[in-house]
Each structure stands twice: as structure tokens, then as C-alpha cells.
């Protein structure tokens, strides 16, 4: 309805949104840093421990850094560090991941396939654990309930760690940090206000990603 003048969101999704929508810019001021982690059902501490141990290994091996650089690095780095699925035995079942693939660069569709930082990390975790990866795309607000009820094993959807969410699910160790920034209209560029406002609402407000 044209009433959205600014929105505070995480830096990397902000950059992706501005690149795709003319008439917007990111202010230079940064705000608080937020921790990103994956979510697992309460009572499934065994999976929490497995994922945390695997994340530590991937960090020590430089895999997490390379995945991040492939999507959010410098112009020279982006696209140069694609994660390559390992040829390993997958005898330990399937890890079902719940996500909302509308949050680039963490999860989004490309050529009909869900990709992004979170999905590459989940694939790397499965490679380490000898598991198949299955991705379930759903509404953002459905991911935590799906985790809690056992519909999926783990939620990977750019989740910030909050006390409110801790009441319902367990968080893994932090795998990424993101600074919050403000997107505003760039008055030097002509853009269709209503269209931008609707995109703000659909991408960042409707799903309550930051609560």
C-alpha cells in the first residue's frame, strides 16, 4: 500500500533484496549483530550434539568459510567456492530439513533447485554423517512447528537465536553472524512505490522472521 518507508533486516538478505529491486539503498549505519543457528526439537539432544560436532569440524577444515565466501564474499570470491557433494556411503538414514526458500543468500530457488548457504551447510553435515539430505520447503512460520512435531529433523532458514524461540526448540551452535542494516527508498531513483512496499511485506514482515 506504499506505507513502508524503511525496514531493518540482516545485511546479506538486504544486499540481495536491493540488488533485485531498483529504487532502494542500504544506509551505512550498522546495528546489532545477530547469531544464526539451526533449530532442532527439544528432547533430541543427540542430534544437537551430532550437528554441533560436525559444524566444529567443518569450521576447522575451512568448509564453512568457503561456503560463506561463495555467496557473500568479495566480487572475486562469489561463485568461486561451490560446495561439492562428497561421494560417501549414506547408510545412516535421511536428514529432513525444513526451510523457507525465500531468503537469499541463505536459501532460495535457482534453476528449480533450493540452494544457498544453509542448504550447502546441511549438505556438508549430511556428507559428514553419512546421511541423505531431504529438503522440505514451507512457510517460514511453519518451520519451527514442523521441527517440534517431528515432521522435519532440523530447521535451516536463517533463524536468529532468540529467547522466545528457545522456549520451543533447541538451537545448534552459531554458524554465522549478521549485522542488521536499514533499507530505505533511494530518492535519486524512480521506482514504483506500491510494488516495493508489497515486496517488503512479503519478504520481511509477513513471516515475522525477526521475532
What residue spans do the PLM features occupy?
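Short amphipathic alpha-helical coupling segments at ligand-binding clamshell hinges
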Residues: 10, 43-57, 63, 117, ...
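Periplasmic-binding protein-like
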Residues: 11, 15-52, 75-88, 101, ...
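Ligand-binding clefts/hinges and TM-proximal coupling segments of bilobed small-molecule sensing domains
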Residues: 22, 26-30, 53-92, 195-208
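A ligand-binding cleft/hinge motif common to bilobed small-molecule-binding domains
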Residues: 4-32, 142-145, 157-168
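A conserved helix-loop-strand patch within extracytoplasmic ligand-binding domains
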Residues: 1, 43-45, 131, 160, ...
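Extracytoplasmic small-molecule ligand-binding "clamshell" domains
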Residues: 50, 66, 90-161, 166-167
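Short, Asp-centered acidic motifs that coordinate Mg2+ and/or phosphate
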Residues: 5-6, 25, 37, 96, ...
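Hydrophobic residues within well-ordered alpha-helices
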Residues: 1, 10, 38, 51, ...
Amino acid at each position: 500500500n506504499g506505507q513502508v518507508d524503511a525496514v531493518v533486516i540482516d545485511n546479506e538478505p538486504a544486499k540481495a533484496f536491493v540488488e533485485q529491486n531498483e529504487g532502494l539503498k542500504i544506509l551505512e549505519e550498522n546495528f546489532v549483530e545477530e547469531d544464526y543457528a539451526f533449530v532442532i526439537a527439544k528432547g533430541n539432544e543427540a542430534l544437537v550434539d551430532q550437528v554441533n560436532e560436525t559444524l566444529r569440524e567443518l569450521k576447522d577444515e575451512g568448509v564453512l568459510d568457503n561456503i560463506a565466501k561463495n555467496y557473500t564474499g568479495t566480487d572475486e570470491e562469489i561463485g568461486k567456492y561451490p560446495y561439492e557433494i562428497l561421494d560417501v556411503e549414506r547408510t545412516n538414514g535421511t536428514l529432513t530439513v525444513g526451510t523457507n526458500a525465500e531468503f537469499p543468500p541463505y536459501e532460495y530457488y535457482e534453476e528449480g533447485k533450493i540452494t544457498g548457504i544453509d542448504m550447502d551447510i546441511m549438505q556438508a553435515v549430511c556428507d559428514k554423517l553419512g546421511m541423505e539430505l531431504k529438503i522440505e520447503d514451507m512457510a517460514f512460520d511453519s518451520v519451527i512447528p514442523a521441527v517440534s512435531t517431528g515432521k522435519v529433523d532440523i530447521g535451516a532458514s536463517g533463524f536468529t537465536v532468540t529467547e522466545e524461540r528457545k522456549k520451543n526448540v533447541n538451537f545448534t551452535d552459531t554458524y554465522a553472524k549478521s549485522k542488521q542494516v536499514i533499507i530505505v527508498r533511494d530518492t535519486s531513483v524512480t521506482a514504483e512505490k506500491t510494488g516495493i512496499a508489497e515486496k517488503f511485506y512479503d519478504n520481511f514482515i509477513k513471516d515475522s522472521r525477526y521475532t
